Amino acid sequence: MTLATAAPIARPCVVCIPARNEEERLPILLASLAGQEGFAAEAPLRVVILANNCTDGTVPAIRALEDAGALASLTLRVIEAALEGAEAHVGTARRMALDAGAAWLEDEGAPDGILLTTDADARLPADWVASNLRALRAADVVGGRLVIDADRAADPRLAELHARIERYWAGVRRLEDILDPPPHDPAPRHGDHTGASLAVPVALYRAVGGLPPLPCGEDNALVSLLRESGARLRHCPDVRVMVSARHQGRVSGGMATEMARRARVLDGEPYLLPEAAHWRTLILRRATLRRAFHLAGSARAEACARLGLGPDACAALETCPNDIAFVERADRILESRSAPARECPLDRALADLDALALSLREAA
């Protein structure tokens, strides 16, 4: 499908991007946004860029693309901000970008519009916006799959490591499908819901108080708030984003930190992940909580008590609108009391996951 033949996007939306010193990568992202299916000069895609604390040519690079006519299918709002002190981080910048996007849609009379966010160093397939909106027909929030946009000259051992790590997380989801399959997020699905690709309606974003302005993990914190409100999170395999494989990033604990960790594995550092038994315990606990929600009166309280939830916790959980919210809120309480997961090297973790899945299937 080409831009000339693509059906126009019916639901109003805006893409919200925090950017700091991204004069090289941001033009690549903007080019991929300008090529999104369903948008054209007469029906442009709204984009907010929060350029924070930039000391390079990030904003001039944007203006150069505009002057060249390369962004005709976009309506751009570039906000320059100088964040200070403890607020000078990606959490504040992403919050400001999303808030600006929400206000834009509300001002245009579209409070039912959709906020999408991605990273300034990402690259998007042409159907990214359309795939998000399709997935939202049966969900409240959509997370996109992260595909590492690796350098072709990178060590092939690194690509093999990426594949093994992905297989580990696919194995965790396979356990979930066997023990407690989520009806709102059926297989096939991925497991990513980060700021590199997230879609949420404006009204729902406002209802949970917006994105927590944390220096790291702001995206996961927002998703937690959404799930605890009862939102159906979909990990649609059709929604994907290419993310940078660079080792030097803007955030400690972000994607660049993970890429640097993986690079060290090639030098002999072990890559440790939770043992399979941890996931089995966690999934079964969440399954028990899900069943408990549908029990009435004292039966629910008794089921919660067996898991270690006292009367006060049970009373607080009475306000949960559905089983999604109940499981997320109750599990947060229980997880805070749990010991850290035991970890083991990647190869053993993979073997244990495969063996556990096989034994569960044979026992079914």
Predicted regions and their residues:
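Conserved donor NDP-sugar-binding/catalytic core segment of glycosyltransferases
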Residues: D127-R164
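Acidic donor-binding/catalytic loop of UDP-sugar-dependent glycosyltransferases
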Residues: G57, A110-R134
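Terminal low-complexity segments of carbohydrate-biosynthetic enzymes
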Residues: R261-A364
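Acidic donor-binding loop at a coil-to-helix junction in glycosyltransferase catalytic cores
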Residues: C216-L222, C236
